[in-house]
């Protein structure tokens, strides 16, 4: 079948299992070919082809609400709802999103990008349905990794207590991004391999139904079956919560899927259908991935699966940070690394393998990761939490209440700080400055290159006190030479890279390379700018700011982050609080979410490019001369 001709999922109801198998193959071929060009979350999607098709065959979207947790596994859903023709633009600027989007299709009823939200959203939709006396099915689809998230467990507790009618799909592929960890994962493993319980339940029901008055006997046998399940399966977690359990179901068998889903619709109250799938199914490089490399990636060679490399000069920032921290940890057993299910993305797999006693993957549990680190710091350890900026948002209260308020020495490596590109608004790392800098004890830094990162990391562990956040971007470094011996860096001390007389430009991180290029262009036009590496976002360099105020020249701040509550706002507030008349111009992200696309195009949109910076600086210089 030409999947680009699909307009809506209604045609699925008339297809035989054999025809559905053919459609599965066509969709897999389409996805593998398209993602080889665009990149994307190919592994997760290849694993849920049959499951997604079965859901659309049994349920009636958009009347019935299909709620995809995280949302990166919705490519098949997008194809079945008429968006296959747009896959050439997947995750590209102004193109098809890699996640559900309300403005793309009426079939996308919930947006997500972070995990473990689907069950709470489903509970809300189901309650809205019941209160308004409407009639539709609510079907959240959540992975076994996401189900370990605290928010998902909170929702399960409420759903089971309230007996709210819904069908929960547990997509069990034994992985979130990396292999899953924890007691919940182990429980799923026991359920996965224990078909005896469900076979026994079915046999009892069938036997009793054939006897006179069998329905009454079947009802009275509930206690027997309850005892049986504890004998056969080591703990039926969901049924103890008040949620009926169906499974495990082969997630690549249309017959089993359809039977299970139809059964779930006939049961009153909440039901969980435990579906076993194979992440990456149908494409050997993805199917054989044991550590999560094929969860999400860039373009690759179709024939071999080899990921196409860019022309980067240095290692990735993530790799540099993890290698540097590991080099410290090898000599200092009080350093331990903690990550919330991101050992692959944060490049900690080598650390995990070589220093297993000092490494902790806590699963999709950002709040737990942060407070666990606080507990370690309170007892003499130097914990390092490697976490994406976007996921750190989920642990705000733990940062404030448990770490900062107690002034505990936890070092945070904030990965993917700034614009991240293709994953879009749910993943842009542009909010952390705003919510970290108002924490009284927090130090926030961002290095200009790898060598400075080395020195700042050393100082973070051995020179500074209290909580430390070191931001670093997605992508690769510059390949600069690293000093052999770390230097002390005075906390709050900025670095003047180039002196100038017309405008002072304050920035940090990779933006400084752009500003240095702008400086060269402006020198040709007779405009002299002072370029300052404001590597400490908090505390500010108050000595420099005081001296700058006396020079009576304008200040431009440039940040790949939100302006509200950001670095530039801190500069403006500082001068305002002191009643100093300093002209401060800020460039950054206005009060909006930044969608997906190439980072260079997104930077153009927010005005962080050579042409706009030259224009803004010249305007500042001219207005200052005229004043």
UniProtKB/Swiss-Prot annotation:
One annotated GO biological process: 1-deoxy-D-xylulose 5-phosphate biosynthetic process
One Pfam family per UniProt: Transketolase_C
EC number(s) per entry: 2.2.1.7
Assembly information from the UniProt record: Homodimer.
Gene that this polypeptide is encoded by: dxs
Catalytic reaction list: D-glyceraldehyde 3-phosphate + pyruvate + H(+) = 1-deoxy-D-xylulose 5-phosphate + CO2
Protein name per UniProt: 1-deoxy-D-xylulose-5-phosphate synthase
Example GO molecular function: 1-deoxy-D-xylulose-5-phosphate synthase activity
Pathway: Metabolic intermediate biosynthesis; 1-deoxy-D-xylulose 5-phosphate biosynthesis; 1-deoxy-D-xylulose 5-phosphate from D-glyceraldehyde 3-phosphate and pyruvate: step 1/1
Cofactor note: Binds 1 Mg(2+) ion per subunit. Binds 1 thiamine pyrophosphate per subunit.
Lineage: Bacteria, Bacillati, Bacillota, Bacilli, Bacillales
Cofactor: Mg(2+); thiamine diphosphate
Enzyme class, UniProt record, top EC level: transferase
Entry binding sites for thiamine diphosphate: 72, 113-115, 145-146, 173, 283, 366
InterPro entries (UniProt xref): Dxylulose-5-P_synthase, THDP-binding, Transketo_C/PFOR_II, Transketolase-like_Pyr-bd, Transketolase_C, Transketolase_CS
GO cellular component term, pick one: cytosol
UniProt xrefs under CDD domains: TPP_DXS, TPP_PYR_DXS_TK_like
HAMAP family registered for this protein in UniProt: DXP_synth
Keywords attached to this entry: Isoprene biosynthesis, Magnesium, Metal-binding, Thiamine biosynthesis, Thiamine pyrophosphate, Transferase
Record-listed Mg(2+) binding positions: 144, 173
């Amino acid at each position: 079948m030409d999947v680009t001709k699909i307009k809506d999922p209604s045609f699925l109801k008339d297809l035989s299992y054999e025809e559905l198998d053919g459609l599965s193959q066509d969709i897999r071929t389409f996805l593998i070919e398209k993602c080889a060009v665009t990149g994307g979350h190919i592994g997760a999607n290849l694993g849920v082809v049959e499951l997604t098709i079965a859901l659309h065959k049994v349920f009636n979207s958009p009347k019935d609400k299909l709620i995809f947790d995280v949302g990166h596994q919705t490519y098949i859903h997008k194809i079945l709802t008429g968006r296959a023709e747009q896959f050439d633009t997947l995750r590209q600027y102004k193109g098809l999103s890699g996640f559900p989007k309300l403005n793309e299709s009426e079939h996308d009823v919930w947006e997500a990008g972070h995990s473990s939200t689907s069950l709470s959203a489903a509970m809300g939709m189901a309650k809205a349905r019941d209160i308004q006396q409407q009639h539709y099915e609510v079907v959240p689809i959540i992975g076994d990794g996401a189900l370990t998230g605290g928010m998902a467990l909170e929702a399960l507790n409420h759903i089971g207590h309230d007996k709210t009618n819904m069908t929960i799909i547990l997509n069990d592929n034994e992985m979130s991004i990396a292999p899953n960890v924890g007691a919940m994962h182990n429980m799923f493993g026991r359920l996965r391999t224990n078909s005896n319980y469900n076979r026994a339940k079915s046999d009892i029901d069938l036997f009793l139904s054939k006897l006179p008055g069998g329905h009454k006997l079947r009802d009275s046998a509930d206690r027997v079956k309850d005892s049986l399940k504890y004998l056969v399966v080591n703990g039926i977690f969901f049924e103890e919560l008040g949620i009926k359990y169906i499974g495990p179901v082969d997630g690549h068998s249309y017959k089993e899927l359809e039977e299970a889903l139809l059964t779930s619709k006939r049961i009153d109250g909440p039901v969980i259908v435990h579906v076993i799938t194979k992440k990456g199914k149908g494409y050997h490089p993805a199917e054989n991935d044991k550590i999560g490399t094929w969860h999400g990636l860039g373009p690759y060679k179709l024939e071999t699966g080899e990921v196409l490399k860019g022309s980067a000069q240095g290692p990735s920032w993530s790799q540099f940070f993890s290698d540097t921290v590991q080099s410290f940890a090898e000599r200092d057993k009080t350093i331990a690394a903690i990550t919330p299910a991101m050992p692959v993305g944060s490049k900690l797999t080598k650390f995990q393998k070589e220093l297993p006693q000092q490494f902790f993957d806590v699963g999709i549990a950002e709040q737990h990761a942060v407070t666990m680190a606080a507990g370690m710091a309170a007892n003499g350890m130097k914990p390092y939490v490697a976490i994406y900026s976007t996921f750190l948002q989920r642990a705000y209260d733990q940062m404030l209440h448990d770490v900062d308020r107690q002034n505990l020495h936890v070092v945070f490596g904030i990965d993917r700080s700034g614009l991240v590109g293709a994953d879009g608004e749910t993943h842009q790392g542009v909010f952390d400055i705003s919510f970290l800098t108002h924490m009284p004890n927090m130090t926030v830094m961002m290095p200009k290159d790898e060598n400075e990162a080395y020195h700042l990391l050393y100082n973070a562990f051995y020179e500074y006190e209290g909580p430390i956040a070191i931001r670093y971007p997605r992508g690769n470094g510059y390949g600069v030479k690293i000093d052999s011996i770390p230097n002390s860096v005075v906390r709050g001390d900025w670095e003047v890279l180039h002196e100038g007389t017309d405008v002072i430009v304050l920035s940090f991180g990779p933006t400084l390379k752009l500003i240095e290029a702008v400086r060269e262009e402006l020198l040709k036009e007779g405009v002299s700018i002072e370029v300052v590496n404001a590597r400490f976002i908090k505390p500010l360099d108050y000595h420099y700011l005081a001296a700058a105020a006396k020079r009576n020249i304008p200040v431009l701040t440039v940040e790949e982050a939100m302006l509200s509550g950001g670095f530039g706002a801190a500069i403006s507030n500082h001068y305002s609080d002191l009643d100093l008349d300093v002209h401060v111009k800020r460039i950054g992200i206005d009060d909006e979410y930044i969608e997906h696309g190439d980072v260079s195009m997104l930077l153009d949109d927010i005005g962080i490019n050579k042409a706009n910076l030259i224009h803004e600086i010249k305007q500042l210089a001219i207005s200052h001369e005229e004043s």
